[in-house]
A protein has these predicted regions:
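Aromatic-residue-lined binding/catalytic grooves and analogous aromatic/hydrophobic interfacial grooves
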Residues: 193-613, 630-632, 649-652, 662-667, ...
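Bacterial N-terminal signal peptides
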Residues: 8-16
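Lectin-like carbohydrate-binding module/patch detector with strong preference for beta-trefoil
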Residues: 25-193
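Extended, hydrophobic alpha-helical segments in both membrane/secreted and soluble proteins
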Residues: 551, 617-631, 640-657
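Sec/Tat signal peptide C-region and signal peptidase I cleavage site
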Residues: 19-23
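Short beta-alpha connecting loops at secondary-structure transitions
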Residues: 673-684
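Positively charged n-region of N-terminal signal peptides that target proteins for export
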Residues: 1-4
Length: 799
C-alpha cells in the first residue's frame, strides 16, 4: 500500500509541479486600455499603478521609496499622468513626482539592494517616462513604463521576488515583472483581496477534504513568487474530465478560471521546440464575480471573518464560506458536472437580498472579446487548427438583473447560479482534427441552457452520483488519521513526522490522485497533459504538452490499480488513433529511417505534431504500447485487445526492423538516450532495452490470447521470437566509485544506466531514474537477486 501511495504522490507532482519554460509560443492579445494623459494644471484621472505580478500598487513608503503595497485609498498611492504617452510625469494627489534615484534601496523590506530605485520627489524626472504595450502576457495584458533618460535596462520592474513592499527598479523589456495596468481606485481594489480572517474552529464534513483559511490570491507562497504561483500552489481544480476550472476563493473578486482539454494552438506539423506550428495548451479564460454588497473592505471592521475555502474530494465540490461584520453568512459552491458538461457556481447567503455582484468574462491567452445580452456572456474565435466557444449564463433568484456591454449586474438577490460551458470543434479521428465547426456555438449554447433550466439541487445530485460511481470504487484509510489541520499546515509539518498528521497528508495524496484522474480524463480521446487539464498561464511551461518520456504515462499509473479503467481510455484511444488512423506518427517513424511502424518524440501536441526537442526519443512507442496491454490485463476485454493489437504489433515491427546485432550476440536499440541526461546517443541504453523487452513480451502474450485474430504473418512471428530471445534486457550492474559523493559507500553495486558508459557520464543527482523501469512499472527483477539488491544504491546515487 505504501508503494501505491507513492504513485499518487508522483501523479500529483506530474500534474501540478511546473518547470520553467525555455520557450513558448506567444499568443496575440488585445491592447490594454490606455490611461488618460493630462497636459498640465489640476484635474485629470488619478490611478492606482498596479503590477500584475503581485496585484500591488505603487505607493510612497516611509523610507522615501516607491514600493508596492495593497491599495488603501491613500492620496500618495493615486497617480495621474502629466504629458503624453511618449513623455509624461507621474504625479500623485499629494503633488509628489516619481524620479529615478542613484541611492540604492532594499528590494523588499529586508531584501537585497536595488541600485536604481524609484523615489518620490518634489521635482520632475528628467526626460520623463513613456508607455509601451508589454510584450509579456503571462499574467495578462498591460503596459511597460520606460525611463526616457536610460538605455539598456530601462523598463520599470518589480524588484526581487514578488511580495509585499517591493521596491521598483529597472530591467529589460519582455519580463513579467514589468507589466502594469492603470486602474481607478473607485472601481478597482488595488489589492489582491479584501481583508479576511480565517476560521479557528472549522472541521471538514468529509475527511478527504483539502481546506484553507485564506484566499489563494493572498496565501503565503512556498515558491516566494506571485502570479501563476498562486494558481499552482493554492487554487483548487475541478473538472468533468475535459472541461474544468480553478477556484481562487476571492471575496472581492471571485475568479473562476477555466480550461478545455482540446484548446490548443498549433498544427499537426513537426516544428522547432516552442515553434508556432507546434502550438501550446491555451488558457481559455476566466469568469469574475465582483462583490458589490458593500459589506466588506480592507479594514478590520469590514473583514470577511470565519473564512474557509475547500475542495471536498468525496463529492468533487469546491466551496468558499465567510461571514460579514453584520453576521450574514455567505456560501459559494462549485462543481464541474460531467452529466451536464458545464461548470456551475452557486452563491447563497443566510439572509435574503444580500447577494450583489457584477459578472464578467475575459479570454485567457487567446484573443477574444466577450459580448453580453439577456444575462449571458459569450466569446469565440479560431486558432490555427481549431475553433472555440465559451458561454456563461447568470440565473438569479430574487433581486434585479441588468445586462450592458460591460457585463451582467445582479443586485439584492437571494441566490445566484452561474452556468459556464465551453468547447472546441476538435475531433481526434478526422483528418483535419476538426468537425461540426458551424454547430459549435449552438452546441455550447444548448448545453448551458439545458443546465440553467435545472435547479442547483438537481445539478448537484446528478454530479455527485456520477462522480461517486467512480471515486467510491476504492477506499484507502490510515488508522488514527483526522483532518483537523489546514492542508498547508499538514504540508508544513510533514517533514517533522508528526504521526497521524503526516499519515493524513498521505491519505489525502492518495485520494487527490484519484480525484485528479477522474477530473482530467473523461470525454474526448486525448490524454491529460503536463498540467492535467488546468492552466492559467499564458506562457505555459513546456507548452503544457504531452511529454512521452514519463509524464503522460505517470498520469495514468493509478488508473488500473485503483479501479479507474475508464479514465485510462482517453490515453489508450489517443494512442490507437494516432498509431492506426492518423498519418503523423507513421511519418515520424519514416523520419527515423523505419519503413514500418509508428512512433512519436518527447514533446507532442494533440494533433500528432511533435517538436524537434530530443527527437531521438523514439522508444516512446514501446512505452505507450505497454499501456495498451495493461488495460487488457485488468479488464480481460478481448474485443478491446483485438482492436488495439495492430498498434502493439506495429510498434514491435518498428523495433524488429530497427534493432542492431551487437558483437556480444545481443540485439540493441541504436542511438538511444536515457532521459534527460548523459550521452546524447548510445546503443544498448538500459531504459530502451527494458522497454523493448516489455513490448515484445506483451506482444507475444497478446498473440497467445488472440490466436488467429492477431493476424500475424509467420515471418513476423518468427522474427519477433528471435529478436526477443536474443534481446539485451538492459539489466546489468557496475560498482560505485565514489565520484558523486558519499551517499553510498564506494564499491556498492548499482544498476547500469548505459551499457558502454559509466554512471559518471550522467548528471550527479539527476531527477530521472530511467534505468529503473525494470523495477516499476515492469517488475522485471525479483527480490533476493543481485539486480534487485542494486536498486537502493542506484536510487541513493541519484540523490
Amino acid at each position: 500500500m505504501k508503494r501505491i501511495t507513492l504513485f499518487f504522490i508522483a501523479l500529483f507532482a506530474c500534474l501540478f509541479v511546473g518547470v520553467q519554460s525555455t520557450s513558448a509560443a506567444a499568443s496575440k492579445k488585445a491592447a490594454p486600455k490606455t490611461p488618460e494623459f493630462v497636459t498640465s494644471g489640476d484635474g485629470g484621472t488619478y490611478y492606482y499603478v498596479k503590477f500584475l505580478r503581485n496585484e500591488k500598487v505603487m505607493s510612497v513608503s516611509s523610507d522615501n521609496c516607491i514600493r508596492l503595497y495593497a491599495g488603501s485609498g491613500e492620496s500618495s498611492q493615486q497617480w495621474r499622468l502629466v504629458g503624453s504617452q511618449d513623455n509624461f510625469q507621474f504625479q500623485n494627489k499629494d503633488g509628489q513626482y516619481i524620479v529615478v534615484s542613484s541611492q540604492s534601496a532594499a528590494a523588499t523590506d529586508g531584501g537585497a539592494a536595488n541600485p536604481n530605485p524609484l523615489r518620490p520627489s518634489t521635482s520632475e524626472q528628467p526626460g520623463g517616462f513613456k508607455l509601451q504595450v508589454a510584450p509579456n502576457t503571462d499574467n495578462g495584458t498591460g503596459w511597460e513604463i520606460v525611463a526616457n533618460s536610460k538605455s539598456g535596462y530601462n523598463v520599470v520592474n518589480l524588484w526581487g521576488d514578488p511580495g509585499d513592499g517591493n521596491s521598483i527598479g529597472f530591467w529589460k523589456t519582455n519580463d513579467q515583472n514589468n507589466v502594469v495596468v492603470f486602474v481607478k481606485p473607485d472601481t478597482d481594489l488595488g489589492a489582491a483581496d479584501y481583508k479576511t480572517v480565517g476560521s479557528m474552529t472549522f472541521k471538514p464534513e468529509n475527511k478527504l477534504t483539502l481546506w484553507y483559511t485564506e484566499p489563494a490570491t493572498t496565501a503565503k507562497l512556498y515558491s516566494g513568487g506571485q502570479g501563476y504561483s498562486n494558481w499552482m500552489e493554492y487554487a483548487l481544480p475541478i473538472g468533468d474530465g475535459q472541461f474544468g476550472a480553478c477556484l481562487f476563493g476571492g471575496v472581492y473578486r471571485d475568479e473562476i478560471q477555466f480550461n478545455e482539454k482540446t484548446l490548443w494552438s498549433g498544427t499537426p506539423a513537426r516544428s522547432s521546440q516552442g515553434g508556432k506550428g507546434y502550438g501550446k495548451y491555451e488558457n481559455f479564460g476566466s469568469i469574475y464575480a465582483k462583490d458589490l454588497s458593500g459589506e466588506f473592505g480592507l479594514t478590520t471592521d469590514k473583514a470577511a471573518s470565519n473564512y474557509v475555502r475547500l475542495l471536498d474530494l468525496t463529492t468533487a465540490t469546491g466551496k468558499t464560506m465567510f461571514k460579514s461584520a453584520a453576521g450574514v453568512e455567505y456560501t459559494r459552491e462549485y462543481i464541474a458536472s460531467n452529466p451536464a458538461r458545464v461548470v456551475v457556481a452557486h452563491y447563497t447567503a443566510s439572509k435574503g437580498g444580500k447577494l450583489s455582484f457584477r459578472f464578467t468574462m475575459a479570454a485567457g491567452s487567446i484573443t477574444a472579446d466577450p459580448t453580453y445580452a439577456n444575462g449571458e456572456g459569450t466569446f469565440s474565435g479560431k486558432l490555427e487548427t481549431i475553433s472555440y466557444n465559451a458561454r456563461m449564463k447568470v440565473v438569479p433568484v430574487g433581486g434585479t438583473m441588468t445586462t450592458d456591454d460591460e457585463g451582467i449586474e445582479v443586485i439584492g438577490a437571494d441566490e445566484i447560479m452561474v452556468v459556464l460551458g465551453g468547447g472546441t470543434d476538435f475531433d481526434a479521428y478526422e483528418s483535419t482534427y476538426t468537425k461540426n465547426t458551424s454547430a459549435l456555438a449552438q452546441t455550447i449554447s444548448d448545453r448551458v441552457a439545458a443546465a440553467a433550466a435545472k435547479s442547483w439541487a438537481e445539478l448537484y445530485a446528478e454530479h455527485v452520483a456520477d462522480y461517486q460511481s467512480f471515486f467510491n470504487r476504492c477506499e484507502f484509510d490510515l488508522a488514527g488519521t483526522k483532518n483537523e489541520m489546514t492542508t498547508n499546515s499538514l504540508i508544513d509539518s510533514y517533514n517533522s513526522g508528526r504521526g497521524a498528521d503526516a499519515l493524513m497528508l498521505e491519505q489525502l495524496y492518495f485520494a487527490y490522485g484519484r480525484y485528479l484522474e477522474i477530473s482530467s480524463s473523461r470525454g474526448v480521446d486525448s490524454p491529460s497533459n503536463l498540467q492535467g487539464i488546468w492552466n492559467n498561464i499564458n506562457g505555459v511551461a513546456w507548452n503544457s504538452d504531452i511529454h512521452s518520456n514519463i509524464n503522460v504515462q505517470m498520469n495514468y499509473w493509478p488508473a488500473e490499480p485503483t479501479n479507474l479503467s475508464e479514465m485510462h481510455l482517453p490515453f489508450l484511444n489517443y494512442i490507437w488513433a494516432m498509431a492506426e488512423k492518423q498519418p503523423q506518427w507513421k511519418q515520424w517513424a519514416k523520419l527515423q529511417g523505419q519503413n514500418r511502424g509508428w512512433t512519436c518524440f518527447t514533446e507532442n501536441n494533440i494533433f500528432g505534431g511533435v517538436s524537434a526537442f530530443k527527437n531521438n526519443y523514439v522508444i516512446a512507442n514501446a512505452w505507450y504500447a505497454t499501456h495498451l496491454w495493461q488495460h487488457y490485463r485488468y479488464t480481460l476485454d478481448r474485443e478491446y485487445l483485438k482492436r488495439v493489437f495492430p498498434a502493439m504489433l506495429s510498434a514491435s515491427q518498428f523495433w524488429m526492423d530497427r534493432l542492431k546485432l551487437a558483437s556480444d550476440g545481443t540485439y540493441e536499440c541504436p542511438n538511444e538516450w536515457s532521459p534527460e541526461h548523459g550521452p546524447e546517443s548510445e546503443n544498448g541504453v538500459a531504459h530502451a532495452q527494458q522497454l523493448v523487452y516489455d513490448l515484445f513480451s506483451n506482444t507475444l502474450a497478446a498473440i497467445e490470447v488472440l490466436g488467429d485474430d492477431a493476424e500475424v504473418s509467420a515471418t513476423d512471428l518468427a522474427t519477433l521470437k528471435d529478436r526477443f530471445s536474443k534481446l539485451d534486457k538492459g539489466l546489468a550492474t557496475e560498482n560505485y566509485t565514489g565520484s558523486f559523493g558519499s551517499a553510498i559507500p564506494t564499491g556498492t553495486k548499482i544498476l547500469r544506466e548505459w551499457k558502454y558508459s559509466s554512471y559518471t557520464r550522467g548528471e550527479n543527482g539527476h531527477r530521472h531514474m530511467s534505468h529503473l523501469m525494470c523495477l516499476y512499472p515492469f517488475s522485471q527483477i525479483e527480490p533476493g537477486t543481485e539486480l534487485f539488491d542494486a536498486v537502493p544504491g542506484s536510487i541513493c546515487e541519484n540523490g
